[in-house]
Amino acid sequence: MVYIMGFEGSANKLGIGIVKDDGTILSNIRHTFITPPGEGFLPKDTAKHHRSFILSLVEKSLEESKLKPSDIDCLAYTKGPGMGPPLRSVAVTVRMLSQLWDRPIVAVNHCIAHIEMGRLITGAVDPTILYVSGGNTQVISYSLKKYRIFGETIDIAVGNCLDRFARVIQIPNDPSPGYNIEQLAKKGKNLIELPYITKGMDVSFSGILSSIEGMVKNKQNKTQHSVEDLCYSLQEHLFSMLVETAERALAHCGQNEVLAVGGVGCNQRLQEMIQQMISQRNGKSFAIDERYCIDNGAMIAWAGYLIFKNGTTTPLSQTTTTQRFRTDQVDVTWRD
């Protein structure tokens, strides 16, 4: 029986999780750094938040799982991609605990962790993956020991687009900007025309963001658009672009399953649009709820276990972090 403790801190969510080798999630504690409306989270402030809470989350995670440090077989942490200072703050703590508890370390790619957690929770076998979050937007499929990127954003991530629009309209960041936009969008009735940019399987979101920001700033000129209609229209355009590129990837790869992962993946409207598309192809769509879609420690623990079970660990001298760590850089040794 193997127990892995996972540490996630690539952005504003700090997560500690413990997973057993059969996929049982024993604990999944998370604490989010939330800023006032209209503000984003700076790397140095986020890192300070992580340093302040990480040890208490480790204690809570052990308590919830009813385990002792001596029961933990390996420590897994997010190597990247993500924000530099928060990543480093978590990595330093993991190195300290590794030496204190005399346990090996496994470095994990954040994107791979999202994918493998999605496969674990849903039972999806070989899906086309729509990975949508605050820092990443990619259409991915597995082939020849790699998770290969067939399409991605050429500028900003979809979650970043939503977050930045939330700042413009000054809505709360609690529990998250994207969630609050989703709730406002449900009240929208009028679809406003916005830029729609897909290039093959790639997408671009900077133009649509610039356009809708301009509409908000022109409200003093008595524009007729309500905040609800703006949120509704933004979501409809963004998600239509994502679903279109995902469908192209499905056709290209000859697959009939779609798995949505990442923080934006728990948006109910996006899930609904994916389901509408895949049902026309007689396929299946898979999605997970906010416990595992949003950044969390359990996903790092599970991805760490998949690496660890093959006998691979990361030497202490190589437990570094990197802000740029692409999904297709990782050798997926645990899949056929």
Curated annotation (Swiss-Prot):
Its main location: cytoplasm. Substrate binds at residues 131-135, 163, 178, 182, 267. Binds 1 divalent metal cation per subunit. GO terms for biological process: tRNA threonylcarbamoyladenosine modification. One of its GO terms (cellular component) is nucleus. Keywords: Acyltransferase, Cytoplasm, Metal-binding, Nucleus, Transferase, tRNA processing. It catalyses: L-threonylcarbamoyladenylate + adenosine(37) in tRNA = N(6)-L-threonylcarbamoyladenosine(37) in tRNA + AMP + H(+). Its EC number is 2.3.1.234. Gene3D superfamilies: 3.30.420.40. It is found in: Cytoplasm; Nucleus. Pfam families: TsaD. One of its GO terms (molecular function) is N(6)-L-threonylcarbamoyladenine synthase activity. HAMAP family: Kae1. Belongs to the KAE1 / TsaD family. NCBIfam families: arch_KAE1 (TIGR03722), gcp_kae1 (TIGR00329). Component of the EKC/KEOPS complex that is required for the formation of a threonylcarbamoyl group on adenosine at position 37 (t(6)A37) in tRNAs that read codons beginning with adenine. The complex is probably involved in the transfer of the threonylcarbamoyl moiety of threonylcarbamoyl-AMP (TC-AMP) to the N6 group of A37. Osgep likely plays a direct catalytic role in this reaction, but requires other protein(s) of the complex to fulfill this activity. Component of the EKC/KEOPS complex; the whole complex dimerizes. This is Probable tRNA N6-adenosine threonylcarbamoyltransferase. It comes from Dictyostelium discoideum (Social amoeba).
